[in-house]
Amino acid sequence: MAAFARMVKGQVRSYSAPVDMAIPASKRKFIPSSGSYPKGFVVSGTHVGVKASNTKFPDLALISSETPCSAAAVFTTNKFQAAPVQVSRDIIKTRQGQGIRSVVINSGCANAVTGKGGLEDAVSMGKKVDECDGLNEPSTLVMSTGVIGQRLPISKILKKVPVAHANLSSTHDAWLTTARAICTTDTFPKLLSRTFTLPSSPGRTYSLAGMTKGAGMIHPNMATLLGVLCTDAPIEPSALQSLLKHSVNRSFNSISVDGDTSTNDTIAILANGAAGGAPISSSSSDDYAAMQDILTSFAQSLSQLVVRDGEGATKFVTVRVQNSPDYESGRLIASTIARSPLVKTALYGKDANWGRILCAIGYTQGVAPGTVVPEHTSVSFKPVDGSPVLNLLVNGEPEQVDEERASVILQEEDLEIVVDLGGGEKGEQGLGGEEAVYWFCDFSHEYVTINGDYRT
């Protein structure tokens, strides 16, 4: 028992300042050493000390465009919506997704369930950024992350906003520092960027960058999950909103760490069009279709970093539900498996207990009639090394499982669970149907320790 206590103590990342410990060696591979960032965007990460114990780490992030942007966002469905969620939602609605210049984010305090005063604090954060830009209309989205039920040290934040504005930069180091500033229990900053082209301008290069944070309280439905994406492609607000909604549904809304949905979850995207070209406005255009694929793939890669940093996680698990009669039914089944504590703890214990997976499939609520037919259902483990799949259940019949091989597969950090519904009532095994993919992690002793100590 003493040895176990020492092991857990060595792993724990207590909630304090953003990324206040050395980044674990196993996570360093996820931190980019360079990037391709969109034209016209500048960023900064500044120390405020929102949380009293934070004496040196950046905890105020500012992302700004040198020109007005189209903007879109998706927000938490939690009924206790934090003040910055309410304020940002109102700004996008009032401005109709036009003329947005910046996003300001603090870590260390969620500004959630803080009443009228909390709303005033969120408004004042955005207004202070607008003043630095010489703007009279609300043009800054606001996000916060941290402990719920506490007021922001707003005077400290407002004092540092001009400093953050003065430090705005387009360098890779600035982007990485900004990604660091939004972290709480995260063990590493989550930042990605890429270039792309569009069919209408094959010779023109565009860039897309994004940062996110989250390690616990992750089961979004749009620890706290926040994300900001920026592109220099020209996209009209209505098209941008539909593009974001589609991509988030297949990325940030398809991950789970612990099944909890935060009061603050927000994913926003800004498009300033600085790279030129014809604006994307119609969902029927080739550019729209290409951008949808690009944004969805990018958002999936970014959201998967959250799962890889799940509190106490030792495994990154992909669950792939095939041959569902419709996408949403497949996603509901994948989500139920991903949320199951029994599945997650079995994976942590390296136990090929496929009965727990089958149980989760069977009690999934809200799926289309005929989606789950026991005699059509198959479950398997797919190794990431490309070796043959390990069948656990085929057409409702259990396989003679090679426990030794199952143990080898479960020793790996990455694992894929494949659930084949056989198309339900629509057809034979393996024919037709939709595919839904979800990403999640296991439950370990460390998760309990981290969250038991969260406010201390």
UniProtKB/Swiss-Prot annotation:
HAMAP family: ArgJ (MF_01106)
Coiled-coil regions listed: none
Site feature: Cleavage: A223, T224
InterPro entries in the cross-refs: Arg_biosynth_ArgJ (IPR002813), ArgJ-like_dom_sf (IPR016117), ArgJ_beta_C (IPR042195)
Catalytic activity field: N(2)-acetyl-L-ornithine + L-glutamate = N-acetyl-L-glutamate + L-ornithine; L-glutamate + acetyl-CoA = N-acetyl-L-glutamate + CoA + H(+)
Annotated source species: Aspergillus oryzae (strain ATCC 42149 / RIB 40)
Family (UniProt): Belongs to the ArgJ family.
Active-site annotation: T224 (nucleophile)
Subcellular location: Mitochondrion matrix
Entry-linked PANTHER family: ARGININE BIOSYNTHESIS BIFUNCTIONAL PROTEIN ARGJ, ARGININE BIOSYNTHESIS BIFUNCTIONAL PROTEIN ARGJ, MITOCHONDRIAL
Official protein name in the record: Arginine biosynthesis bifunctional protein ArgJ, mitochondrial
Native organism taxonomy: Eukaryota, Fungi, Dikarya, Ascomycota, Pezizomycotina
Function: Catalyzes two activities which are involved in the cyclic version of arginine biosynthesis: the synthesis of acetylglutamate from glutamate and acetyl-CoA, and of ornithine by transacetylation between acetylornithine and glutamate.
Any one GO CC term of the record: mitochondrial matrix
PTM note: The alpha and beta chains are autoproteolytically processed from a single precursor protein within the mitochondrion.
